[in-house]
UniProtKB/Swiss-Prot annotation:
This is 1-carboxybiuret hydrolase subunit AtzE. The active site is at K74 (charge relay system), S150 (charge relay system), S174 (acyl-ester intermediate). It catalyses: 1-carboxybiuret + H2O = urea-1,3-dicarboxylate + NH4(+). Pathway: Xenobiotic degradation; atrazine degradation. Heterotetramer consisting of 2 AtzE and 2 AtzG subunits. InterPro entries: Amidase, Amidase_dom, AS_sf, Carboxybiuret_hydro_AtzE. GO terms for molecular function: biuret amidohydrolase activity. The gene is atzE.
Length: 457
């Protein structure tokens, strides 16, 4: 059952929250030995939360919007009583979290049932979730391939039918990449939209949090439940709630929709270009739009990511570098050694860059681009080729996402299934101006309703 069917089934009494919970736990038990999406399961908590929903329904109470819906979170979200690993060996020695992360609190208030924590790249520094401490998360559509990252467990858990909803983080593409490679829906909200309090940071000035889901409705319901100001999070600049569910079915009539060319075409393989072409045709988009300074924006994002990420872990890099995984330790060290002038220059450029990007949206409401250059490569792949150019695999997965998140724009990643692509999915980015998540979701709903974007479980 999809998100809406689960919620309606519980509300109507056709099924119980406990039955839904037990079915999800059974699916996890049957599949996760191969997929490796989960790093912990909160079984007792899940059953207690599900039972509480069933009690409320039996009393005739009006149920909250996500009542009984199972979900799981990337293991950089605090879960009360659980150590927040952030994909690392180093964090194993930390005490258990004393409280849930704010977004987990808000989903609990909305009635969702937490089933556990999910695998990720160490400290969120990666695009593949080939974690050497906890093992690689495998793509449910071909278990010899990566699930993407750094929120790989969050994408794989949905694609494997383990949960209909998950939470991830996105600094340079870490929601959109696994959504693309696993064939699920993902939403990276506007920078500053959702509270980050109670999560383990990576790059404070770029980190975003958001949902992955089995449907556009799932994204919208979860997103609305998590919205709200947080005066205790200096990075949360949202001043009000802007519900997306009431406008989700308004369609795209009158919206100005363009297709990103240049960098976003040159760095997209045949399947990615085909996915965009079909989405553009469906959404009535024919004009090509050029995103300003995409390559420089990506380079500046790399500088800031390495610098902030490295400095955050400086003490551990000095005394226990051997406890970092090989895929991240060298990048953290190089980030610490970068001249501060590089960091300052990148941040100054970012202000100008945002202004240039925002100017695009004077003429356009939605812009379409591929989410990843190719579909999921095999686990262990070191190099990929895109249109005749050879790229190192791991950073190349973010070629098309980094320029967008660096500008802070909201994006929906829509799962499409191009022909002649070995049966593998690839995502399409639906991008809007800051604070216009609902436009992305509306366009996604059109792609879903026409069958262009969908899940295959």
């Amino acid at each position: 059952m999809k998100t809406v069917e689960i919620i309606e089934g519980i509300a109507s009494g056709r099924t119980s929250a406990r039955d839904v919970c037990e079915e999800a736990l059974a699916t996890i038990g049957a599949t996760d030995g191969l997929i490796n999406a989960f790093t912990c399961r909160t079984v007792e908590r899940a059953r207690a939360e599900a039972d509480a929903i069933d009690v409320r329904r039996a009393r005739g109470e009006v149920l909250p919007p996500l009542a009984g819906l199972p979900y799981a979170v990337k293991n950089l979200f605090d879960i009360e009583g659980v150590t927040t690993l952030a994909g690392s060996k180093i964090n194993r020695t930390l005490p258990p979290a004393r409280a849930d992360a704010v977004l987990v609190q808000r989903l609990k208030a909305a009635g969702a049932v937490l089933l556990g924590g999910l695998n990720m790249d160490e400290f969120a520094y990666g695009f593949t979730t080939e974690n050497t401490h906890y093992g690689p998360t495998r793509n449910p559509h071909d278990t010899g391939r990566i699930a993407g990252g750094s929120s790989g467990g969050s994408g794989a858990a949905i694609a494997a039918g383990q949960v209909p909803l998950s939470l991830g983080s996105d600094t340079n593409g870490s929601i959109r990449v696994p959504a693309s490679l696993c064939g699920v829906w993902g939403l990276k909200p506007t920078f500053g939209r959702l509270s980050r309090r109670g999560t383990y940071p990576f790059v404070h000035s770029i980190d975003h949090l958001g949902p992955l889901a089995d449907s556009v409705e799932g994204l919208a319901l979860a997103y609305d439940a998590m919205q709200g100001p947080d005066p205790l999070d200096p990075g949360c600049s949202a001043s009000r709630i802007q519900p997306s569910v009431p406008v989700l079915s308004q369609g795209i009539a009158g919206l100005r929709i363009g297709v990103l060319g240049g960098w976003f075409r040159d760095n997209a393989g045949p399947a990615a270009r085909a996915a965009v072409d079909v989405a553009a045709l469906t959404l009535g988009a024919s004009e090509v739009v050029m995103w300003p300074d995409a390559e420089i924006g990506r380079a500046a994002a790399f500088v800031i990511t390495a610098s902030e990420g490295g400095c955050l872990h400086l003490d551990d890099l000095r005394i226990r570098p051997q406890d970092f995984e090989p895929l991240s330790v060298d990048r953290f060290i190089s980030g610490v050694l970068q001249p501060v002038a590089w960091y300052l220059r990148a941040q100054r450029f970012r202000r100008v860059y945002r202004d240039k990007v925002n100017a695009l949206f004077r003429d356009w409401d939605i812009l379409i681009a591929p989410a990843t250059p190719i579909s999921a490569p095999a686990i262990g792949t070191e190099w990929i080729e895109v249109n005749g150019t050879r790229h190192p695999c791991r950073p190349a997965m973010g070629l098309l996402t980094q320029p967008v998140s660096f500008a802070g724009c909201p994006v929906v990643a829509a799962p499409t299934w191009p022909g002649e692509n070995d049966g593998m999915p690839i995502g399409v980015q639906l991008i809007a101006a800051p604070w216009n998540e609902s436009l992305c979701l509306r366009a996604g709903k059109v792609l879903q309703d026409t069958g262009i974007a969908r899940l295959k479980c």
